[in-house]
Amino acid sequence: ATQIVTDGQLTVWCQQHDRETLKPASARAYELPSYCSAESAAIVSLLMTLPKPDARIKRAVHGAMKWFDTYKLTGLRCERSAGEHGVRDTRLVEGPQAGPIWARYYDLKYCEPYVCDRDGLPRRRLEEIGVERRNGYSWYNSRPAELFEQYDIWAAKYDPKHKVNVSLNSQGANERGIIEMYRRPVMDRTAFDVVVKPGQSIQDAIEKAPETPTNPFKILILKGNYNQKVIIDRPNIVLVGES
């Protein structure tokens, strides 16, 4: 019931789902509703261990494996190295000989990889988020790769008629042009608590936030000149300029 259906096709799961609607849901500030690779791989691995799988399980596994094959990323690798002052730095770099990887999260609109910081705003590049989240979270993984051989055996045994052709050696979605890895994000104004226009007070917007907000209070500042003195006297305030 929670497996995401897109254009009539079963795909994968979100990291968390709403307990009432069963739709993809948010958890921590940087865990947004998404197609999630690693968690979905764990689900598929479990489903393939069930004896005598029924038609629903077969469809779920076939659908997820097709998604894993379609949206794998190739020619890339996640590099962790000592950056400035010895602080670990994580980057996504070219890796022609590397095996396929998957982003932790793919957005629900374009099915394209993204990363996120504690401000809850998705971004396309690791270097666009802070050091703490960039290095303290697994943004890319190879967990689904472990399923491909297992799936071939499972499908041949239980449902060869509907077996999906999958391969770790074919080009990924990024190299085939199915996705745009670094699509410039369109600012979603509905994602912000307050939008400030030129001539309006940024301070007034800040003071609309709770004194101790439990979630980031996001303020979008539209393009313009703001000759204002601002005092941020409460935590979890996120100021974002219109790009």
Where are these regions (language model features)?
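Terminal, non-catalytic domain-edge segments
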Residues: 20-24, 31, 35-161
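Hydrophobic pocket-lining residues that define ligand/cofactor binding sites across diverse proteins
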Residues: 1, 68, 209
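Extended hydrophobic secondary-structure segments that form protein cores and membrane-embedded regions
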Residues: 66, 219-222
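Active-site cradle of extracellular carbohydrate-active enzymes
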Residues: 1-34
